[in-house]
Structure formats: C-alpha cells, structure tokens
Amino acid sequence: MKKITYYLSLFIIFSCANESEITLKKFEGSPEFQEAKLSLNSFDLNENSAYDFSFNVENYQLGDQTDGAGVNGLANSAQGQHIHMIVNNGPYSAHYESEFSKQINEGKNLILFFLSRSFHESVKNPNAFTLMQTGGVDNDQPYDLSSEFLFYSRPKGVYKGADTKKLLLDFYLVNTEISPQGNKVRATVNGKEFIIDEWVPYYIEGLQIGEVTVKLELINSNGELIDVPFNPVERKVTLE
C-alpha cells in the first residue's frame, strides 16, 4: 500500500510539474508607426473573378523587417512588413506589396485591411486601416460600416519549435474603444478567461503542445456580448 501511495504521489508531482499556467501579458517595445497610413486607391473585379486591389502606403515600408524582429520571441515573417486582409473575420491573408489580387466569395463580404509589422502585430492608429464591403445588393442588406467591430488577427496557423513558447494575441477594433469603465474584449484561451480593457498587443505563454482554442468577444460594460456581425469569433491553432 505504501508503494502504491509513493508512486501515486510521484505521478501527481510529475503531472503538476508539466502543467504550466496559461498567462496573458502586454507585449511592449514595438515601433509605434503613428504616422503610417493605408488608403485604398481602387478595387476592381478582373476577368478571373478575383478582385484587384491597389493601396497607397505612406510612412511605412512594406517588405522591411520591423525593429525587434527575431529577438522579441514572436514568430516573424521573413518577407517583412505587410498588409493583413481579413474577410468576414476569417483567417487573414498577408500581402507584401501595395497592389495584389484576391479571390473573394460571391455575396456580401466585410473586408478589413491594416498595416502589420513583420511579426504580425497590427499598426493601431486611425489611418492604418481600411474597412470596406462587397455585395449587399438585392435582398442582401449591406453591412453598417459605422457599427462597432472586433476583428481577430493572431495567433494563427501552426507554430513549431521556439515559436510555440510565446504567441502573439492581437485583434483590431473599428468604431469602438475598450476601457476599464466601457467596452472590453473577453479572450478565452483553452478555457481560461481574460478580460482585456486596453487595446494593445499581448502575448500568451504557458501553452502545451497540441491544439489551442482562442475565442474573442466584444462585450459591453455589463459583460454582455455586443450584437454586431462576426462577434464572437473563435479560432484554433496548433503547437508542434
């Protein structure tokens, strides 16, 4: 009996040692790019049923490596700074030039573009994004672009090796602010809930190898879900 108790104690100690606590902390130190600007010049449906987008980018260099890349512990794009494109709050596509084509499903689509650092942290200033929509004709009512929106950006996809240690949690707010007294973002990571009241990037630590589920919700001061399109949003990523 003593031997069984001994091995059980060892198992509990070993299990606890291998279960790390999930934490969420502010990520600080990135260049701010407060003068960076992204504006849409044109978008046209081409003969291949894809959209051709043309942007004007000011005070920001696409393709450059952002200061801090490679030393801040975050997954980084070797292709440098880019534009994130999010359609209907789905996973973003990254674009490294100011002109590109993208296939988009027919029907009503809400599309957000914003400038991104090479390690996928969004540039958060009033001129660094463009919000638009396609479709919304006939009986399909268009989106109200003045509504409050929460867009999910990171984490995304598959993380390997050292990139699994620290995951960037980043989202984009449009037509709303978050604060201790006002709206907030509720982030749930593998069942652990965090209430966010400051729009800054964060990083997640303490995750185990395997599948990670991240859910983001825009909530009001009473903790109630705000009834706007694509809220809440949930995403799964994999750590290998």
Where do the language-model regions lie?
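C-terminal motif of bacterial Sec signal peptides marking the signal peptidase cleavage site
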Residues: 12-15
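Short, compositionally biased P/S/T/A/G/V-rich stretches that sit at domain boundaries
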Residues: 19-48, 136-161
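Short amphipathic, basic-aromatic surface patches that mediate peripheral association
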Residues: 39-40, 57-74, 156, 171-177
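Short, well-structured beta-strand segments within conserved domains
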Residues: 51, 55, 105-117, 171, ...
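Short acidic/polar inter-strand loop motif in beta-rich domains
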Residues: 92, 116-125, 194, 219-228
